[in-house]
């Protein structure tokens, strides 16, 4: 029934597309492949087997697998395992794959075989056929360049796919995420310095608390971003160790003893950052622990961004019914029915990205558990979610800094609320005790008066002493405010 279904589906696709097809052979026999396709029978089978979604491996992943095939071909030529003419054609074809010239030829769905074998073969076939074309041969003939015997020498999908994930993640983190986070860190630090003179009411449990400088709040945001950068850099060190060289189950069967170390050296040269062979192939191929760790660091960043963005939204709420302590850049109209309404759309966008990344991490965690014995069987979905998280965090952090944080301005609402607030009574505690201070705060709240006026009536402290004790500036630093206690 399954075979009949596939044949029928293949026929329907032909009729619908009105394409011309070529006959191509693989280890299972003949199969029809579009005449202009660079992929082959193995890929075509996978394309028909997995009509699940429109999700494909990302540009960063295809770039990485192309680099691996190129480095492998160079290494195999050096080791005398690959003819120079064939090898040079494979190198050229692999470079073209990395450059994005054949992205449309990577047609296998993300929801495929759990090892990613279909995508490894997709790469092997595209590179093989392009190399055949370069050498003047017939695409689909598998001569003089064979996808397995030449492009895949010394490799297995079981070590190529996890290595591709690591390299794609590292490359994207280096080129996109870290620069984006550093830009956001600079923006928060700049606002921290700008806003340090401005004192506002603290809000623990969303209730009035002792004063804090607006700059101190932004310094906290900067600290969260800085620590996320540090965590991600630790994860980068783990990702730099790759599975290549373990082949099928980690033993390295059918690979040259010097293959992996030489390929890693070549990859380091191509990429501009260090790639090293794992010290333990059995853990590297049987688990996705390093990928799970990296995703966890991205999730932590997402949690930080959600909290920071919500704080910015709250502080900018209003303009008349909210806190209104800051104003955000007005980037677009906010309502189709309420004129002049402007919403905090950039922080809202970041919150949605954070939610997506947190969900992606849950998927990666489940994928990481799904290894039986010597291989993980959810590598494609782990790759998709990890790389998507890196991509959307990179763009959203850059967007947050440029379109929001850099343009934030402070209002006078914060200092005004401090003067009216009750929490400044806290600095009376060292002088008159907790219970008496609480009584003064309750009386101020009930009477609608401020702490200063009530304290003048209810304590023996002079106005001069109270001005010094209740000075909000002194409350934003360690120590007791005001006059000597006793």
What does each model-identified segment do?
Residues 2-486:
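Conserved, well-structured ligand/cofactor-binding cores
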